[in-house]
Amino acid sequence: MLLAFLLAVSVADWVPVHWPSGGVKSLELLKGTAVNCILIEPSAWSRDFSSAAANQGVDVLGVVKPSKDALEQARRAKDLGLSGISLEGEFDDNVRKSLTDSNIPFVEIGPRINMRMEGAALVSATNQGVWPGINTVEDTAKAAPSGGPWIDTNTGFLRFTRAASDLPVWIANTPPPKTIVPVERYLQAIGDAAMSGARWVVTFEDDFANKLMARDPATLAGWARITQLLAFIEEHKQWRAWRPGGEMAVVQDVNSGALISGGVLDMIAVKHTPVRPAPTSRLNPALMKGATMAVNMDPASLNDAQKQVLREFTRNGGSLLSGPPGWKFPAAKPGEITLAKDDVEKLDAIWKELNTMTGRRNLGARLFNVSSMLSNLLVSPDGKRTLLYLVNYSNYPVDSVTIHLTGKFKRARIYQPGKKPLDLAIYPIEEGTGVDVEQIKEFGALLVE
């Protein structure tokens, strides 16, 4: 897509926020932060605002929602000097074609089933997602099939999307309506996306937005924590290019439930087992490199070349669990992003098979005292360094985290927002290398080499 507007920042480096004001003075809140792309409603559009934002190195995307005058709104945004358009909702191909022909940059933030995984799109984005955090039912933590508390997360879906697309991935899920959200939940939403290499389009609930614009001291302190985490992630943006490091691969695609939250990838992650998505459409030997186990969710969907990849995988010593027809999860439907009740019951059967297959084997990393956390294991392009993201979904710090990694490492360092990198002691274990982390507050990254 040719960019008619002069963008202040490369699209791949956009750090997006739904901004609640079109007042030029509100831009002061962005100074010194990593935020460089704001999405604003039509009522907030003005040439003065877009000009001031551009002078500050911030791109402004005008939010356009489905309506009969959507194209007119887009042209108005162009006339007012906005950087581009954020199409939020479902639009027909005529709107996309007209914007492209008019050389107006746009991102599409709509249903998961309409996500652009390839082609000329600027980003692959959706506005559908669960609100990350520990799922509670009547104040009691809901149990996952693995026995631990169930954590609502978008990571499985986002990991698949990252593996299936070369585009930047955004998720623009919103806080629960009419709910005052503690700042920790915003941090969890940012971390939930970031550890999968995606970005959450930061969106405030009304109370936070109003207090932020009013410069309420407590809200400003919360905003500082949000921007601190965003800055930390961007300071280490090179980690997005690292490949999945888990030894278990899940062969799955859009038509077998990969766009659904709460499915197999999430179930395995909740067990704290490193897992890598292997999109059927991209299945090749390189994708399976380093994997020792694989789950094929829909064997009937594979073509001959893809079947050959899995045959070679097993010939080279890999273990393959091919699911029966009853294991196949349905493709995502309009308005649905989580498993139906009948499909949830499938997870129990799949879990039992996976548990038998994996036993107590360490598939890259084994974590202890992390019931409120999720992790993601990555390997550097040269294969010499390993990174373990750690995200805490409780509103309180987690102390005394123990990590057992496969492989022999000589150095370990923990990175956390607002703290200097800290070298950690390592010790030999039967599986490879042990590391103890004193505390994880919200988000951390353990780097070993």
What are the language-model segments listed below?
Residues 6-300, 304-333, 337-345, 434:
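Glycan-processing catalytic domains of CAZymes
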Residues 420-430:
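Extracellular/luminal ectodomains and secreted, surface-exposed scaffolds of diverse proteins
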Residues 234-247, 258-265, 342-384:
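Glycan-recognition and catalytic regions of carbohydrate-active enzymes
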Residues 404-421:
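Solvent-exposed beta-hairpin/edge-strand motifs
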Residues 447-449:
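Short beta-strand-to-coil "C-cap" segments at the C-terminal boundary of structured domains/repeats
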Residues 246-271, 300, 370-407:
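Carbohydrate-binding surface patches
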Residues 403, 434-438:
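Exposed aromatic-hydrophobic patches
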